[in-house]
């Protein structure tokens, strides 16, 4: 069994969504945690739970961030966390239950395991995992949008994300 200790200082969770049909808005969640258990040498034994604090959303625009925290989007007063719990892990895919605003759907994402390395700063063994995917926000009750005069809508329904998580590991 491998012991995994999440390193939030060397991890990130970023997203992007189409805006006004012509560009993308990018942002991040600044507070999240990932708990992993299992044997790093046997992917089938790995189980993970990610917990994201939606009120930590950061798009570098306070007014937009406040709107995203409102009931139009994440409703952070009522829903204080987003979770992802794995059901299965392979070398390049992860399947699990994603819960946003109390709505749970099974999702499949791409995963990249980057092996094990020795940290030259403290001698610890570390590993990294990068998870990427696309989420249809409307499946989670995040339906806010506005029609554009030129056709189309203000916001795309698909949100692309990349989560990069680093862990100290020990046996």
Curated annotation (Swiss-Prot):
A Pfam family assignment: YceI
SMART domains, sorted: YceI
InterPro entries xrefs: Lipid/polyisoprenoid-bd_YceI (IPR007372), TTHA0802/YceI-like_sf (IPR036761)
PANTHER family the UniProt entry points to: PROTEIN YCEI
Family to which this protein belongs: Belongs to the UPF0312 family.
Identification of the protein by name: UPF0312 protein SAB2563
């Amino acid at each position: 069994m491998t012991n995994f200790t999440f390193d939030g200082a060397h991890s990130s969770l970023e997203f992007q969504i189409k805006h006004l049909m012509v560009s993308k808005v990018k942002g991040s969640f600044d507070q999240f945690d990932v708990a992993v258990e299992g044997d790093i040498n046997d992917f089938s034994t790995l189980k993970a739970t990610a917990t994201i604090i939606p009120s930590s959303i950061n798009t570098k625009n306070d007014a937009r961030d406040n709107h995203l925290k409102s009931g139009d989007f994440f409703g952070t007063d009522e829903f204080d966390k987003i979770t992802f719990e794995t059901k299965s892990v392979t070398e390049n895919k992860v399947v699990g239950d994603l819960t946003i605003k109390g709505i749970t759907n099974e999702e499949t994402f791409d995963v990249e395991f980057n092996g094990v390395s020795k940290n030259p700063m403290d001698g610890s063994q570390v590993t990294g995992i990068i998870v990427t995917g696309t989420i249809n926000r409307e499946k989670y009750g995040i339906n806010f949008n506005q029609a554009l005069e030129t056709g189309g809508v203000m916001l795309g329904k698909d949100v692309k994300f990349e989560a990069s998580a680093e862990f100290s590991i020990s046996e």
